[in-house]
C-alpha cells in the first residue's frame, strides 16, 4: 500500500541496503508485486492444518485464497488510476476473484459469509471468522497497541473515559448509507456523552452554553472491552483501554464478491447474473431483518450500473475500517480517481438535514486548489534525510 500513499519508492528487497538506489516507477513496483504474488500462489497451501499456521479452524498464515484475493485487487488497482490499464486488467481481476469464489463454493476453501453482519467484527468470531481470507491476529496479553479501541470515537463520549477522536464518519456518507443491520453494526446507533446516562442521537448538542467541539457519526468496528465481552453502546461504564486484540481483517470474502461484480461490470464481460447474485448475497445480509426487501439488484441491470453498485457496496461493506483493510474506501476512490471530486465537495461543506429540522456539517473544513499531490502523503523525513533522491517529485504515473 505504500506506493499508493507516498508515490514512487525505492524498489528494495529486505536484504538490500543501497540508499543511493534510484526511485522505481509505479509500473516497476506493480510488476514486482504481481511477480511475487504469482510465485506465492504456487508456494502456499489452500488450508493449513497445524499450529501456528492454523488455529481455531481458520488459517493464520497466508493461504492460497488470500494470495489470489490480493492479486485480484492488485489487478483492480492496475486497471484504474494512475496506470489506467483498463478492460484487460478488470478481466484479470474478475478471473482471479472468481477462482477464490468458486473454490469457496466447492469447499476447497472453507471461507463463507457469516449470516449476520454484526458478527463480522464481533468478539465472538474474532479468532475464528470463516469470512476472513487474510487477517493479522493479536493477543492482548502482550500489552501492545494493536487495535486501539479508543481511536474512532469522540472525546466527549462516555465509554472508556472518552475516545481519542482520531477519526469520525463523514456526515454525507452516513446519510447515504443504506439502513439495515450493516449500518447498525458499523456506526454507534446511539451514544452516551460524558457524565450522562441518557442515550442520544449522534447529532444532539444538548448544552448551547458549552457546545460540542465535533458533532459527527462515529464508527464502532474497532471498539472492544478489556474483558472480552461484546461492546455495549448502552453501557457508559463499560471497561475499555487503549490496547485491544481484535483481528485486523485485511481481506474478507464479501469484498471478493464485490470486486468480482465490479470487475465484471467495468470490463463489460462475464456473467451479469452471477455477479448480481453475489452482490445480492452481500446486500441481503447488510439489510438483515431491519429491511424486508431482498435481491434489490436485478440481472437486467447494465454493466455500468453493476460496476457502480458493486463499488458502492464495497464502500459500505468496509466503511470505517481503515485500520487494517487492504482496500479501504479511500483506496477505491484513489483507483477510480475520485478523490479530487470529493475534495471539491468537501470544500462546499453543505449543511445536511440529518433529522427533521436538524442540520449538521463537517467540523473540519477543506480549502485550497486541487492538484494530484494531494493524493499522497509527504515522504517521511527519516527516509528522505538518508536518501536525497526521495526529495524529487515525479509524476504519479511514472
Regions found by a protein language model. Give the residues of each.
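Short, cationic motifs built from Arg/Lys/His that form the positively charged side of catalytic pockets
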Residues: 7-10, 252, 283-286, 314, ...
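Intrinsically disordered and other compositionally biased segments
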Residues: 12-13, 325, 332, 396
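Residue-level signal for pocket-adjacent positions within structured domains
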Residues: 16, 328, 372
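Elongated scaffold/linker segments in the mid-to-C-terminal portions of large proteins
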Residues: 95, 99-257, 266, 334-393, ...
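C-terminal structured "cap/appendage" subdomains that terminate the fold
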Residues: 279-283, 287-347
Amino acid at each position: 500500500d505504500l506506493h499508493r500513499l507516498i508515490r514512487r519508492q525505492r524498489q528494495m528487497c529486505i536484504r538490500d541496503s543501497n540508499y543511493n538506489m534510484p526511485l522505481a516507477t509505479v509500473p516497476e513496483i506493480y510488476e514486482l508485486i504481481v511477480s511475487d504474488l504469482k510465485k506465492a500462489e504456487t508456494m502456499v497451501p489452500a488450508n493449513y492444518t497445524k499450529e501456528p499456521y492454523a488455529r481455531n479452524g481458520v488459517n493464520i498464515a497466508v493461504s492460497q485464497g488470500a494470495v489470489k484475493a490480493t492479486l485480484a485487487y492488485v489487478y483492480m488497482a492496475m486497471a484504474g488510476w494512475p496506470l489506467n490499464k483498463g478492460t484487460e486488467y478488470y478481466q484479470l481481476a474478475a478471473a482471479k476473484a472468481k477462482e477464490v469464489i468458486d473454490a469457496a463454493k466447492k469447499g476447497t476453501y472453507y471461507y463463507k459469509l457469516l449470516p449476520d453482519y454484526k458478527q463480522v467484527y464481533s468478539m465472538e468470531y474474532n479468532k475464528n471468522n470463516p469470512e476472513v481470507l487474510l487477517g493479522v491476529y493479536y493477543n492482548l496479553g502482550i500489552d501492545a497497541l494493536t487495535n486501539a479501541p479508543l481511536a474512532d470515537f469522540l472525546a466527549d463520549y462516555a465509554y472508556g473515559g472518552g475516545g481519542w477522536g482520531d477519526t469520525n464518519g463523514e456526515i454525507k456518507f452516513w446519510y447515504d448509507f443504506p439502513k439495515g443491520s450493516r449500518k447498525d453494526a458499523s456506526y454507534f446507533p446511539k451514544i452516551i456523552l460524558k457524565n450522562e446516562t441518557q442515550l442520544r442521537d449522534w447529532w444532539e448538542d444538548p448544552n448551547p452554553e458549552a457546545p460540542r467541539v465535533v458533532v459527527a457519526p462515529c464508527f464502532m468496528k474497532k471498539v472492544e472491552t478489556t474483558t472480552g465481552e461484546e461492546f455495549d453502546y448502552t453501557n457508559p461504564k463499560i471497561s475499555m483501554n487503549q490496547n485491544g486484540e481484535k483481528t485486523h481483517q485485511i481481506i474478507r470474502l464479501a469484498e471478493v464478491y464485490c470486486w468480482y461484480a465490479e470487475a465484471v461490470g467495468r470490463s463489460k464481460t462475464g456473467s451479469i447474473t452471477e455477479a448480481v447474485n453475489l452482490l445480492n448475497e452481500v446486500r441481503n445480509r447488510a439489510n438483515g431483518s431491519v429491511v424486508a426487501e431482498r435481491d434489490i439488484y436485478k440481472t437486467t441491470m447494465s454493466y455500468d450500473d453493476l460496476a457502480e453498485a458493486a463499488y458502492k457496496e464495497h464502500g459500505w461493506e468496509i466503511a470505517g475500517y481503515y485500520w487494517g483493510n487492504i482496500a479501504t474506501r479511500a483506496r477505491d476512490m484513489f483507483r477510480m480517481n475520485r478523490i479530487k471530486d470529493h475534495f471539491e465537495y468537501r470544500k462546499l461543506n453543505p449543511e445536511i438535514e440529518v433529522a427533521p429540522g436538524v442540520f449538521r456539517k463537517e467540523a473540519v473544513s477543506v480549502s485550497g486548489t486541487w492538484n494530484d499531490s494531494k493524493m499522497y502523503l509527504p515522504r517521511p523525513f527519516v527516509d528522505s534525510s538518508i536518501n536525497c533522491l526521495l526529495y524529487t517529485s515525479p509524476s504519479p504515473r511514472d
